[in-house]
Design a protein with these regions (language model features):
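ABC family nucleotide-binding domain
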Residues: 1-4, 8-220
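C-terminal boundary and immediately downstream tail of ABC-type ATPase nucleotide-binding domains
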Residues: 221-242
């Protein structure tokens, strides 16, 4: 489904990604973790072409992301993306946020789009908030709306870039619960996160990054029980000590 081969990226003279290779199979959940500044968010943004890369190749459902002939907007319409800061339109209601891209990008009728939107709001526990504006919702609720908006496009895969890092601690679980349900329904997911409990619960594999490199790419149980690299051992000892 998602394949990265020898991907490298520079910001001018600074190399932020160094020869990164991994893949995510259909229906697989892969968590990408590592210390701040390790290249995690940059890597996931390269997957749908939000960030260009200079070497290597990335393909999603056999479509080459870096090929100049590739219609990136069309590809992005098939890949759901959930960001750290929600990125909802503040001047539109919750329902209008869900309807807009369905109508403009997919060409769906408004009635069908609203029906799909309401079904997804119910799925994330926010049906009664359809007529509200994002500013009237908590951070956790806004992030759940963002997930519903991404799902409204019927994506073949979902990318999450630290979806809980901007939330108050007590709101994190309501977002993770939605993501766990998505994973158990078979959604292909690539998730950048520090939520190791989520990783243990639903990830099939964990990719650990440090200084722009993929240091480990291992089945979840193996990563947590017997990390191969010293760097991953240090990271886990710090993040799991409490």
């Amino acid at each position: 489904m998602i394949t990265l081969e020898h991907v490298s990226k520079w910001y001018q003279s600074f190399q932020v990604l160094k020869d990164c290779s991994t893949e995510v199979a259909k229906g697989e959940v892969v968590v990408v973790c590592g210390p701040s500044g390790s290249g995690k968010s940059t890597l996931i943004k390269c997957v749908n072409g939000l960030e260009p890369f200079q070497e290597g190749s990335i393909s999603v459902a056999d479509v080459a992301v870096g090929d100049r002939k590739t219609d990136l907007p069309k590809l992005r319409a098939r890949i759901g993306m959930v960001f750290q800061h929600f990125e909802l339109f503040p001047h539109l209601t919750v329902m209008a946020n869900l309807v807009l891209a369905q109508v403009k990008v997919l060409g769906r009728g408004r009635a069908e789009s609203e029906q799909r939107g309401m079904k997804l709001l119910e799925r994330v526990g926010l049906r009664e908030h359809a007529a509200k504006f994002p500013g009237q919702l908590s951070g956790g609720q806004q992030q759940r709306v963002a997930i519903a908006r991404a799902l409204a496009m019927d994506p073949i895969a979902m990318l999450f870039d630290e979806p809980t890092s901007a939330l108050d601690p007590e709101m994190i679980n309501e977002v993770l619960d939605v993501m766990v349900a998505l994973a158990r329904d078979g959604m292909t997911m690539m998730v950048v996160t520090h939520e190791m409990g989520f990783a243990r619960k639903v990830a099939h594999r964990v990719v650990f990054m440090d200084e722009g490199r993929i240091v480990e790419d291992a089945p979840t149980a193996e990563f947590f029980q017997k990390p191969r690299s010293d760097r991953a051992q240090i990271f886990l000892s710090k993040i799991l000590q409490h």
